[in-house]
């Protein structure tokens, strides 16, 4: 149904891998990413029968009370090819208390991004920064951004987590991210459109 929405350029579903449930309930069962031609095309869907049909369909299999929505700008940090069936890690982040959004995004792009790009085995890395308009009128979005990383498979991702480079990335989190564990899921990507 999403494929019938006007202005959709790309649509990807990423389903949390089954083995993730062995460690407890993941933060999300998956994510849906939708890219539009532009923001106006996305806003033009409000009130349309097509969007209402998508929302009615979602209600059949998604607990909409747990669903989040953020509008982001993507920054591609590393863009090597990924094999079919690659492990796609998705981390949901918030800035540390008292940190301005601009400072958070700058640190993430300019300091944390290069650290992440150096992790062995990393194929692709995209930072999705929540758009500044999400903070208008004192609003506080659920997430300040989403980090998306791809590895050949789950074993490669888990091996990367044992490296000094990963440790440097983890240590840097304290410089700009909310204290505590990162909300993270390991998924399989399914490209529907694009």
Where are these regions (language model features)?
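Macromolecular interaction modules
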Residues: 1-194
